[in-house]
């Protein structure tokens, strides 16, 4: 396992990063990054594609008014994919906007992101500049990081409550959701945010959908709340999920 190094991201901002090759190295790697457990973990997965401007504005407020303040209040760490797009960008910007101090950890394939020692390429994606730590993992395709992201969350939680929030999302988010459910992590689906989130919200309402969605409902770990619900309602539901006995929540649809 390599030692941590600093990544210069943008505007003079830097963040510590570490590259791992084996799941067995994760505990040591996270300690090397000065990330300690146990602590509550919020996992954020999904995207922001094909979202209307009105819904996009509402989504940004979800991060600024609910997710970032909740993480700060709980003393949680937040784990996501770390790139400067979609929900990961929103999470980083929300953390900066409220001047939060919680660790924001990006887990991403080393081969898919722009790194200081690499010749610039249109084939790589920029890292989000407000993340505080990066874990760089093996893989050459988006989705290769999904099991690693779930493992990072589990290692950091170390028995403390953890919850996954799904916003929008496509095929990679399916992998993220699946891996986090394997880890017995409750899932909150933001209904009305589009694509995968709406597919899963429909399944939670009992509407006919594909087999993967039916399996998710059968897990009993997933529930949904509509994007149009009040931010107080969203905050209250997430607090309930974090405090649920054993970290499990009953499946239901709100709104």
Language-model features: locations:
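SIR2/sirtuin-family catalytic core signature
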Residues: 216, 227-251, 255
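Acidic/glycine-enriched connector segments
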Residues: 2-235
